[in-house]
């Protein structure tokens, strides 16, 4: 047996035809690397005082913008998949795949911030003056991303509500922003999808009515238990806690109270969409609700990671310029960025708060036989799928 490392053997293995010698598009041409890799314009170099870390600053922010573009690309495709009233399971799988891709990209963006932190505040000061009045506040793609997700103008902090003014000299940017403010956002489409959750029909399973009965029974049992408490202080404390719980549940069972909370910006979903989200959460172990529950988890992941990215950005800015200086674009810098960490910027805030309304597993309304069949998948029975259709 001949040695595989002999030169003749290696030569024969490597003797394939070199594709680069054929006519056609090469790697660099396909990726347009001549444009991408020549886009790092260092103003410190042009000013005859080159600052090494300016190159890192430019490359990192250009990478952010490329990833923002990919997230927007995925968001647009997801919104398109959600735009139809009838969503097949195969489409839901595609939505999950693309939402997960956005989550993975956002994790990468969060991890990019520490790379910028390898630059010291003094290093940044060496070229900061070249940036003014440029600012991350002027990132058109990030504003488009926020709008496409569902951040509404009224939920932005006061300074951020006038975010379009920085694009006044760019009619194309203003038009794109206007489009994203009027077209259905991902949050809008998810809300309509949740409103169609099977089992909410009052003349069907009527989950909401059954859930309300379960809560009333649970609170009555807890109240009876509290009344049997011998120690007055403990009894009063338990009764007070039950009264608070009753008020919390009233905020979801009374549509007017819920709508008032939406008007105040403390909730996002319509009353019926919130019902759908709670139902999916309770029955997530049922086969037909497995994918919808995963979808809700991914939406929260997206909100969480954007908040983490904002937080990391805030800490980095404080390290670089402190908490008193103005940002290069004229904002209050650190103070403004810190204000964006509030719940006002959480698009899917209601999903985070669903745990407030959970009840013990044994108190969850049992599914009827008909509903149990509707939420289960039959294997190899086309007639079953014809009868039950897809989830929403």
From Swiss-Prot:
GO terms for biological process: L-tryptophan catabolic process to acetyl-CoA; L-tryptophan catabolic process to kynurenine; ommochrome biosynthetic process. Pathway: Amino-acid degradation; L-tryptophan degradation via kynurenine pathway; L-kynurenine from L-tryptophan: step 1/2; Pigment biosynthesis; ommochrome biosynthesis. Substrate binds at residues 57-61, 128, 328. Pfam families: Trp_dioxygenase. It comes from the Eukaryota. Belongs to the tryptophan 2,3-dioxygenase family. GO terms for molecular function: heme binding; metal ion binding; tryptophan 2,3-dioxygenase activity. Its cofactor is heme. This is Tryptophan 2,3-dioxygenase. It is an enzyme of class 1 (oxidoreductase). Heme binds at residue 313. Its EC number is 1.13.11.11. It catalyses: L-tryptophan + O2 = N-formyl-L-kynurenine. It comes from Anopheles gambiae. Keywords: Dioxygenase, Heme, Iron, Metal-binding, Oxidoreductase, Tryptophan catabolism. Heme-dependent dioxygenase that catalyzes the oxidative cleavage of the L-tryptophan (L-Trp) pyrrole ring and converts L-tryptophan to N-formyl-L-kynurenine. Catalyzes the oxidative cleavage of the indole moiety. The lineage of its organism: Eukaryota, Metazoa, Ecdysozoa, Arthropoda, Hexapoda. Homotetramer. Dimer of dimers. Binds 1 heme group per subunit.
